Amino acid sequence: MGNVIATRMGVLTPSAAIVEIEEPVAQVVNASLKERGFEFAVRPGPAAGCEFLSGIQPWTVGQPLSPMLQRQASALFAFDLLSQNPDRRKEKVNCGLTKEGLVAFDFEMCFGHCFLPIVGGSRAEIWEPSKSGLAARHLFYAEMRAHPPLAGAVQSLIGRLTTEWWNETVCQLPVVWRHDADIIGQNLKAAATYADEFARDVATRCVL
């Protein structure tokens, strides 16, 4: 779901997909995993997948940002703070470059704070991302500190997360995922309600 929300906020991502894993496929995959020494296994049922992007170049930490890349990095910074994603940092960039610009991937830890509060490290409100302590560890913290995101631009990105859009998105999800989606949706609704406060926090306190 993080992938879909990031895309809605203007972040370039591989296209998300729901993949149905049948029992025979799971058996073949798990046998292969076991042969290779892996200790985990896949389960039959719906799973999240995404488009394979060929020709993506690795991101070099500290490389200069063009105006286009600065805008894309700002959108990604705002999304990662909204979702309290701790997994996009200098040691693990989880993004790359294509001809379209900065592409983000790996969203598995997004919104983890909705289910395991310790992940976020704070009982702060969703519109107070500076209190999560994650901003200073973000991949683009130095760039955002040098050129802070515009509060108006961040507020506009949050404004795309409408209740109507989210309800339509949830209707397309497998039933077994909808409970978690409802919890995430409550966070999105709160962020949209306090979009101005969220945007000002991202543009000021998050980049101190």
Model-inferred region functions:
Residues 1, 26-29, 62-65, 112, ...:
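Surface-exposed beta-strand edges and their flanking turn/coil or helix-capping segments
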Residues 1-61, 82-86, 99-100, 107:
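Conserved ATP-binding subdomain of kinase catalytic cores across diverse folds
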Residues 4, 22-24, 68, 114, ...:
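Surface-exposed loop/turn and secondary-structure junction residues enriched for glycine/proline
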Residues 41-55, 95, 115-127:
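Short, surface-exposed, charge-dense and proline/glycine-enriched linear segments
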Residues 56-116:
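Conserved kinase catalytic-core segment
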